[in-house]
Regions:
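Structured-RNA-binding interfaces characteristic of tRNA pseudouridine synthases
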Residues: 1-148
Length: 149
């Protein structure tokens, strides 16, 4: 068996989050279906964390095991992304990892970004990607938030 780490980008707006759930579509479920189809074997994918509904990812790490050695990584990524094209999910990179690698337990750090847009007008471009606060936020509160996050 070979272990591969992938980096993924996705929007969770129309999903229940990362983790597979009965009767609801998740990022994990879509990736497992597409990878299983591409590799012609049942694939289980493990994420470095589990994002909730409404939480997007720009470089989520995950891993899967397969019987196949993936020689041409660019062709593999392109073919998987072709099948992912109807979803807001994309594989950014893939790396072969040693036996024992685990996306969650081998992670050294995690980075989170929180976007707050403070204005009266409704959000259009950033809708579902930021927390919209219509009331004016004071400067002291803003500085305090920067240091805590």
């Amino acid at each position: 068996m070979f272990t591969y780490q992938i980096k993924i980008e996705y929007l969770v707006t129309n999903f229940v989050g990362w983790q597979r759930q009965k009767n609801n579509l998740s990022i994990q479920e879509v990736l497992e279906k597409v990878l299983s189809k591409r590799l012609k074997e049942k694939i289980t994918i493990i994420g470095s964390g589990r994002t909730d509904a409404g939480v997007h990812a720009t470089e989520q790490s995950a891993h899967f095991k397969t019987k196949q050695h993936i020689d041409d990584k660019n062709t593999f990524i392109n073919s998987v992304n072709f099948f992912l094209n109807k979803y807001p999910i994309s594989i950014l990179s893939i790396k072969k990892r040693p036996k024992g690698f685990h996306a969650r337990y081998s992670a050294i750090k995690r980075t989170y970004k929180y976007f707050i847009i403070n204005r009266r007008s409704s959000l259009v471009i950033e809708k579902n990607k930021a927390w919209h606060i219509r009331k004016k936020i004071n400067e002291i509160g803003r500085a305090s938030c920067r240091e805590r996050v």
